Amino acid sequence: DIQEFYFKRAMKVTRYEDEFCYYVRKPWGIPTTFGKEKSFLEYLFEWSEKSWSYPFISLLSKAFTKDEERGLLNRLDNATTWLLYFAKTPQIKQAYKDLQKQGRVYKYYLLEIWWDIGYWIKKYGNSIDFPIAHHKFQDDRMVVLLTSDLKSKIKWASHEVKTKIEDYSYDKQSNRAIVLVSIQKWIRHQIRSHFSSIGYPILGDAIYGKKKERYDGDLQLFSIGLRVGS
């Protein structure tokens, strides 16, 4: 099974831990958790009896139920890759939830975009804080409310979220920039739709990318870590 081989390979080289969490790399193109499609969590825990599995899988199965998502602390969009965090105990998961409610959890991502974001930062600052809502007619995308007339396209209420640009590096030759961002609150496709809405789409974005800018690779958006602030 080629899919099993792929996940087996990914797991062997990209799992580590500290005193609070296990950190596992989620591959591209698969849902994080249980839903309509088979998810990364299902593959991970279905194979817990395999000889190549790590002990942490069975430990999480004992500590958390399926409804508790086996201790999962964050979710990534299907097309986003790299770090998922799993709490080692229910107490750690609850402490994380409490910190998140207090706005003290900062999640960090690296992304690659078209063009020099420095121009936008000089004019508007380093935060993108337009509200985001689910699209009324297209289930696979979100709407960024740059103007009030876009409210006719939204389903349900909008979400007040902020994507903060922490740092960036622009390469003039390729006309691309590597950007480090942080978020606190999170809504589906937040970083992708925010950057596209201001004219700097992420490379490989099949939904929010610009068709005239050709890039055949996967979405260049990576979950790289988190920080607890004061």
Positions of PLM-derived features:
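RNA pseudouridine synthases
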Residues: 1-230
